[in-house]
């Protein structure tokens, strides 16, 4: 009984402590930090967003309206980007694969910001195949895998990200008639129960990866399907059926991304996924700075070359 009373008092103290307002607390002053952000896309005009990172009491960054933004291609000056409002600066240069791009930002009263990146090539997807019953989801349902074959160069450090739009529909036949159907569709950005060596090497289920351990010029990536989806069933009851016809489609999108884009996305993952030292109940979280390749400032200067392969249609009897 005595032990119960002590535990009750401790709980009461903990609750009252959590509800007590901290008086005379002042947030430390945060000097606005110049920030350069840009993700150049192959085939589109170059651009850059210049802002100032603010303190915790600011919801949005403050736009920089008076910057001089100079753009370089392969080490040669190309143009001065024009300000279009809200800190957005745009140019007329079209981003092209395998070219080096650099950006210099001059802001009165601050050190000059500088960043550079290389535009990757678009990935070449050579084949897409569906492997039935590759794994099972949390509810014990059989899930297919999407096998994506693509070309790469093992002699260069290359980086990729992918997403898969898919729809799977099952039609249950009885006496030659469809009596029930089920389906699910959506977009996949991760792989469940990951057993692909490249994804395992990344230590993440996200479809963000490098060719670090690939030794051949072509690789087949195995993505065990799972996605945020809309599902339905035309009937809520179950009867005997003669056969099932599976229909649907799979559309793979894959992008080549610059090294800076890859490391930034990786740092985002680390920020969003708690580690072993994180205890949200106690307010404990591991400090982490997002990756930045901007000299004298914050932000990321990256490049992406997206592609979408042909749609694969499914029409098979199981």
Regions found by a protein language model. Give the residues of each.
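C-terminal motif of bacterial Sec signal peptides marking the signal peptidase cleavage site
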Residues: 15-17
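A sequence/structural signal for flexible, mid-protein segments enriched
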Residues: 19-318
């Amino acid at each position: 009984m005595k032990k119960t009373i002590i535990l009750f008092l401790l709980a009461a103290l903990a609750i009252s402590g959590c509800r007590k307002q901290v008086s005379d607390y002042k947030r430390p002053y945060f000097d606005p930090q110049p920030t350069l952000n840009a993700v150049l896309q192959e085939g589109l005009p170059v651009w850059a967003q210049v802002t100032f990172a603010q303190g915790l009491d600011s919801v949005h960054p403050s736009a920089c309206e008076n910057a001089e933004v100079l753009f370089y291609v392969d080490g040669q000056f190309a143009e001065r980007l024009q300000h279009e409002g809200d800190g957005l600066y745009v140019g007329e240069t079209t981003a092209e694969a395998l070219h080096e791009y650099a950006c210099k930002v001059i802001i009165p009263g601050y050190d000059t910001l500088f960043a550079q990146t290389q535009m990757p090539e678009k990935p070449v997807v050579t084949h897409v195949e569906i492997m039935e019953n590759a794994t099972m989801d949390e509810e014990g349902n059989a899930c297919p895998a999407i096998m994506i074959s693509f070309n790469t160069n093992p002699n260069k450090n290359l980086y990729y990200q992918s997403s898969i739009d898919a729809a799977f529909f099952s039609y249950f036949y009885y006496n030659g008639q469809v009596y029930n159907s089920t389906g699910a569709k959506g977009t996949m950005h991760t792989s469940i129960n990951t057993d692909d060596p490249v994804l395992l090497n990344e230590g993440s289920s996200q479809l963000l990866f490098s060719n670090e351990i690939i030794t051949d010029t072509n690789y087949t990536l195995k993505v065990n399907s799972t996605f945020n989806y809309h599902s339905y069933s035309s009937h809520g009851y179950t009867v005997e059926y003669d056969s099932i016809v599976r229909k649907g489609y799979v559309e793979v999108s894959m992008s080549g991304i610059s090294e800076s884009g890859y490391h930034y996305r990786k740092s985002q993952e680390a920020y969003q996924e708690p580690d072993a030292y994180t205890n949200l109940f106690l307010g404990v979280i591991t400090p982490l700075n997002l990756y930045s390749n901007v000299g004298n400032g914050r932000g990321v200067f990256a490049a992406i070359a997206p592609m979408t392969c042909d749609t694969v249609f499914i029409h098979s009897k199981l």
